[in-house]
């Protein structure tokens, strides 16, 4: 029965499918918001109205893309679908909690959309800094609704994290050690630990902001002995691990894709890859104040956060060079998924290099809150996380659906998207170096050229999004069945065929390990 299957589901494959569909839908909303931003900035002068409505759009774009697109697709979609199949578990450890994790997201999304519909909306930026987010600068219910939205999304992610940690540690075959699980499983495990440690701090921060706004507390108000800088520390102690939460599952997917299409039986440097992800996860928690170089910290504090941030480049470099070593000498198959993976490696590295530039506290004083920062994090998100999602989608689409995509169109889609995102975000480095500030709806006309090119690039990306919707429709309409998939020890998720039966591994699986 439809309701029993999709509303009260306890099946990891169905819940994974729900996450993928929800994430795709939210991605459309986030894309629409981003196109509003680029339409406003395509020429000098005003299009939408004042800076408040513009900043409401910017804030909603960030929240939708992070909490309702990337996280549901990577952790909820790919994580739910693949982790049990990869470790030979019959399902997740807590199947009903898994269902609740998903169904907390639509109400959360509804609250976020409601926040923009009441009063003037939450034009705070996704950081929601007081005093701008206080009840003076943002009177009315908008910011409160945003905070409640974040509470629900946060609970959803915490429950999901508990579920994945329990599943991965406890539901492997007895003979399988943690160091025999695939890298995607490792990446989800580390991501879940990060979520579990980071989200409660965000919850504390936004709850204090909620009481400051409504119950007259003064956690972040100097008039009552509070400090707005405390909020920034709490937010970024969550916010920096969050950006690693967004990219780590992508690392796992890229490892699988590169290994598979290089014709290798395993990735290069498995243990090094695991160590690198663990290091990134640990270091991600001790670099948060590099987002706050302009708030007047001591010089020795700034020196620490600069050097600690640069240390993260080492395990990241281990991963990049291990992917290249996996490619080396392989029988490379130029499939669409491989193109996404290669694009990921190149563009993620570019984004990482601009991150190293921003890690220098003295340089960051000049570049903070300019478009250079926007360019940096969109290279690692829009061309890191999203390229990993796209690569994972075209690679595992046959597993999820039983049908194959049209390879030619998938390659054309990659090409259009590649051109589009680079045309959108590469010029933003120049804008930032020229001093164009973030979060303003208008600019001096000296910045016109690069902004116009950037906005044209966003329209190219839009055509890519529309082409992908068509490709998925075409695949389901044509019904090309999957013929064969080459099995190695590194892609056991394909063991049961495409798509796999509703219940897999119902009996304990026999594992013969070397």
UniProtKB/Swiss-Prot annotation:
Ranges facing Mitochondrial intermembrane side: 41-50, 118-140, 213-227, 287-298, 358-370, 434-446
Keywords recorded for this protein, A-Z: Calcium, Copper, Electron transport, Heme, Iron, Magnesium, Membrane, Metal-binding, Mitochondrion, Mitochondrion inner membrane, Respiratory chain, Sodium, Translocase, Transmembrane, Transmembrane helix, Transport
EC number: 7.1.1.9
Cofactor(s) essential for the protein: heme; Cu cation
Membrane topology term: Multi-pass membrane protein
Cross-link (1'-histidyl-3'-tyrosine (His-Tyr)): 240-244
Top-level enzyme category: translocase
Tagged with keyword Magnesium: yes
First and last residue of the signal peptide: none
Annotated residues for binding of Fe(II)-heme a: 61, 378
Binding site for O2: 244
Domain of life: Eukaryota
Residue ranges crossing the lipid bilayer per the database entry: 12-40, 51-86, 95-117, 141-170, 183-212, 228-261, 270-286, 299-327, 336-357, 371-400, 407-433, 447-478
Residues where Na(+) binds: 40, 45, 441
Mitochondrial matrix topological intervals: 1-11, 87-94, 171-182, 262-269, 328-335, 401-406, 479-514
InterPro entries given in the database record: Cyt_c_oxase-like_su1_dom, Cyt_c_oxase-like_su1_sf, Cyt_C_Oxase_1, Cyt_c_Oxase_su1_BS, Cyt_c_oxase_su1_dom
Binding site for Mg(2+): 368-369
Predominant subcellular localization, coarse grouping: mitochondrion
Catalytic reaction annotation: 4 Fe(II)-[cytochrome c] + O2 + 8 H(+)(in) = 4 Fe(III)-[cytochrome c] + 2 H2O + 4 H(+)(out)
GO biological process terms on file: electron transport coupled proton transport; mitochondrial electron transport, cytochrome c to oxygen
Subunit comment: Component of the cytochrome c oxidase (complex IV, CIV), a multisubunit enzyme composed of 14 subunits. The complex is composed of a catalytic core of 3 subunits MT-CO1, MT-CO2 and MT-CO3, encoded in the mitochondrial DNA, and 11 supernumerary subunits COX4I, COX5A, COX5B, COX6A, COX6B, COX6C, COX7A, COX7B, COX7C, COX8 and NDUFA4, which are encoded in the nuclear genome.
Entry similarity comment: Belongs to the heme-copper respiratory oxidase family.
Name of protein: Cytochrome c oxidase subunit 1
Lineage, broadest ranks: Eukaryota, Metazoa, Chordata, Craniata, Vertebrata
């Amino acid at each position: 029965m439809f309701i029993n299957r999709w509303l009260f589901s306890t099946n990891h494959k169905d819940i994974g499918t729900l996450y993928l569909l929800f994430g795709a839908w939210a991605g459309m909303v986030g894309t629409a918001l981003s196109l509003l931003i680029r339409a406003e900035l395509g020429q000098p002068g005003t299009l939408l109205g004042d800076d408040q409505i513009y900043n409401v759009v910017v804030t909603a774009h960030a929240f939708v893309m992070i909490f309702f697109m990337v996280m549901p697709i990577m952790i909820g979609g790919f994580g739910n679908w693949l982790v049990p199949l990869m470790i030979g578990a019959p399902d997740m450890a807590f199947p009903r909690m898994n269902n609740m994790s998903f169904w907390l997201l639509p109400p959360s999304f509804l609250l976020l959309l409601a926040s923009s519909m009441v009063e003037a909306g939450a034009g705070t930026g996704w950081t929601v800094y007081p005093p701008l987010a206080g009840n003076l600068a943002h009177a009315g219910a908008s910011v409160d609704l945003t905070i409640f939205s974040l509470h629900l999304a946060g609970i959803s992610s915490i429950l999901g994290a508990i579920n994945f940690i329990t599943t991965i540690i406890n539901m492997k075959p007895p003979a399988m050690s943690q160091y025999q699980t695939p890298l995607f499983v490792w990446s989800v495990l580390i991501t879940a630990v990060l979520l579990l440690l980071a989200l409660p701090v965000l919850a504390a921060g936004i709850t204090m902001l909620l009481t400051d706004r409504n119950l007259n507390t003064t956690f972040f108000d100097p008039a009552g002995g509070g400090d707005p800088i405390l909020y920034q520390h709490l937010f970024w102690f969550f916010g920096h691990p969050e950006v690693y939460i967004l990219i780590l599952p992508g690392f796992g997917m890229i490892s699988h894709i590169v290994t598979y299409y290089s014709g290798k039986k395993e990735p290069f440097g498995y243990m090094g890859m695991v160590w690198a992800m663990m290091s990134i996860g640990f270091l991600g928690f001790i670099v948060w104040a590099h987002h706050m170089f302009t708030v007047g910290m001591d010089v020795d504090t700034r020196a620490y956060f600069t050097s600690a941030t640069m240390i993260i480049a080492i395990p990241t470099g281990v991963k990049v060079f291990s992917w290249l070593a996996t490619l080396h000498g392989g029988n490379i198959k130029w499939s669409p998924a491989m193109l996404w993976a290669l694009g990921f490696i190149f563009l993620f590295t570019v984004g990482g290099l601009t991150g190293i530039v921003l890690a220098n506290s003295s340089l960051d004083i000049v570049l903070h809150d300019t478009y250079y920062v926007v360019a940096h994090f969109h290279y690692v998100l829009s061309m890191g996380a999203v390229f990993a999602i796209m690569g994972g989608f075209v690679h595992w689409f046959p597993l999820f659906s039983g049908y194959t995509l049209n390879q030619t169109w998938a390659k054309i889609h990659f090409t259009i998207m590649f051109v589009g995102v680079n045309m959108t975000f590469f010029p933003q480095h120049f804008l930032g170096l020229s001093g164009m500030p973030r979060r303003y709806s208008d600019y001096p006309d000296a910045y016109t050229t690069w902004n116009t090119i950037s906005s044209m690039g966003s329209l190219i990306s839009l055509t890519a999004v529309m082409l992908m919707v068509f490709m998925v429709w075409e695949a389901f309409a044509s019904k090309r069945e999957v013929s064969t998939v080459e099995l190695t020890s590194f892609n056991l998720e394909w063991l049961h065929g495409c798509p796999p039966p509703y219940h897999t591994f119902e009996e304990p699986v026999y594992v013969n390990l070397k």
